[in-house]
């Protein structure tokens, strides 16, 4: 899978509100806020199932009601269409889980 060009990344990010291109590396990132830890953990559980099915896994961390996510395709050395697809799936799951 090929890395997205700078213009392709920018076009993808326009369709992904809340996602940012990370300056320190070839990746995109986002933070999700939930009402409480249970909602945050429920979101992570649902994403884990989708990520496993897609065989593409996020880098993430959870502190109480916040989930910080970084997406990149290590084999390609940057952001690919797989990251964009997973970001869209995560946004849909987050909405169903009550993210703010």
From Swiss-Prot:
One Pfam family name is Pterin_4a
Q: Could you tell me which InterPro entries the record lists for this protein?
A: PCD_sf (IPR036428), Pterin_deHydtase (IPR001533)
What is the catalytic activity of this protein? (4aS,6R)-4a-hydroxy-L-erythro-5,6,7,8-tetrahydrobiopterin = (6R)-L-erythro-6,7-dihydrobiopterin + H2O
Keywords, sorted A to Z: Lyase
Chain segments annotated as coiled-coil in the UniProt record: none
State the top-level EC class. Answer: lyase
Cite the EC number.
4.2.1.96
Q: Name one GO biological process term.
A: tetrahydrobiopterin biosynthetic process
The lineage's top-level taxon is Bacteria
| Gene Ontology MF terms | 4-alpha-hydroxytetrahydrobiopterin dehydratase activity
Q: Which PANTHER family match?
A: PTERIN-4-ALPHA-CARBINOLAMINE DEHYDRATASE
Name the protein family: Belongs to the pterin-4-alpha-carbinolamine dehydratase family.
Q: What protein name is recorded for this chain?
A: Putative pterin-4-alpha-carbinolamine dehydratase
Which species is this record about?
Rhodopseudomonas palustris (strain TIE-1)
């Amino acid at each position: 899978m090929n890395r997205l060009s700078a213009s392709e990344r920018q076009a993808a990010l326009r369709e992904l509100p809340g996602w940012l291109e990370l300056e320190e590396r070839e990746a995109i990132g986002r933070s999700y806020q939930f009402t409480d830890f249970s909602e945050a953990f429920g979101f992570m559980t649902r994403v884990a199932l989708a990520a496993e099915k897609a065989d593409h896994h996020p880098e993430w961390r959870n502190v109480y009601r916040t989930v910080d996510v970084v997406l990149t395709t290590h084999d390609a050395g940057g952001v690919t269409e797989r990251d964009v697809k997973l970001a869209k799936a995560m946004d849909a799951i987050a909405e169903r889980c009550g993210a703010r």
